[in-house]
A protein has these predicted regions:
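Single conserved hydrophobic/aromatic residue that forms the stacking wall/gate
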Residues: 1-8, 12-13
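Aromatic- and glycine-enriched pocket-lining scaffold segments that form the walls
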Residues: 16-79, 83-85
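A general structural signal marking secondary-structure boundaries and capping sites
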Residues: 17-18, 68, 99, 125, ...
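Solvent-exposed loop and edge beta-strand segments that line ligand/cofactor-binding
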Residues: 21-34, 72-90, 101, 106-110, ...
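Well-ordered alpha-helical scaffold segments within catalytic/enzyme domains
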Residues: 36-50, 87-105, 141-155, 189-204
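Alpha-helical scaffold segments in carbohydrate-active enzymes
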Residues: 43, 47, 56-70, 94, ...
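Non-catalytic carbohydrate-binding regions of carbohydrate-active enzymes
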Residues: 106-141, 148-179, 208-216
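Terminal, non-catalytic domain-edge segments
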Residues: 177-216
Length: 216
């Protein structure tokens, strides 16, 4: 626990790229690091950091959002576009889950970014009726982000949940990973989707006195 708090307290001085958000070991821009770091950073600030760096977190998302949509707008690689948008959406909803929702301006800004990223995936022209032309990692990450967004009421359940229920069915039936040779990233993302399918999707408990939002 002490080690976790030490790492959390040093997040605000962790190296950034020229755009202002966390970079990878090769100084490259990498949204996978956002997915790794930002939810942890926000959780630390909510519980132990006094929420002093909330503005830093949203500042990084502002920078990421501007770059992401500038890059994907002109990208002809739809597969790569879908993957990065799906990871970005998952990063946002996981960060929203652990922040104090009463800091409404920041929460709402992140919700706007989240909804825009989900919409952007759906506008890529991919077939999301059965997701047959998605790679498995993107399919799973997008389904996870949408399911969690619906549960947290960041998305309209009636409009979005049905889009990804087929992915849930494939996970439950073992169609996405069926043997020991399946990539570990696919297995871990399938586990995330499964975790959302078994949650109570009708009830939410916002724990104001417990450091943030505790979604059932």
């Amino acid at each position: 626990e002490i080690g976790v708090r030490l790492v959390g307290s040093e997040m605000c001085i962790r190296d950034r790229n020229e755009a202002g958000y966390f970079k990878d070991a090769d100084d490259k821009k990498c949204l996978c690091k956002a997915y790794s770091y930002e939810p942890f950073y926000m959780a630390y600030e909510t519980k132990d950091g006094g929420k002093e760096q909330y503005n830093d977190v949203i500042g990084q998302y502002n920078a990421m959002n501007d770059e992401l949509f500038a890059d994907t707008k002109y990208s002809s690689d739809t597969t790569a576009k879908v993957k990065v948008l799906s990871v970005y959406a998952a990063s946002l909803i996981d960060t929203m889950e652990v922040m104090d929702q009463m800091i409404y301006e920041i929460y709402r800004k992140m919700q706007d970014y989240f909804k825009a990223s989900v919409k952007a995936v759906l506008e890529t022209g991919r077939d999301y009726d059965d997701f047959d032309d998605f790679d498995e990692e993107s399919e799973l990450m997008f389904a996870y982000a949408v399911l969690k967004g619906c549960r947290m009421k960041a998305l309209h359940t009636e409009k979005y949940e049905g889009i990804v229920l087929g992915v849930c069915d494939k996970v439950m039936a073992g169609e996405i990973f069926t043997d020991d040779d399946t990539d570990k990233n696919v297995v871990s993302k399938a586990a995330l989707v499964y975790s959302e399918t078994v949650r109570n999707r009708e009830y939410q408990d916002y724990g104001r006195g417990k450091g943030g939002a505790l979604w059932s």
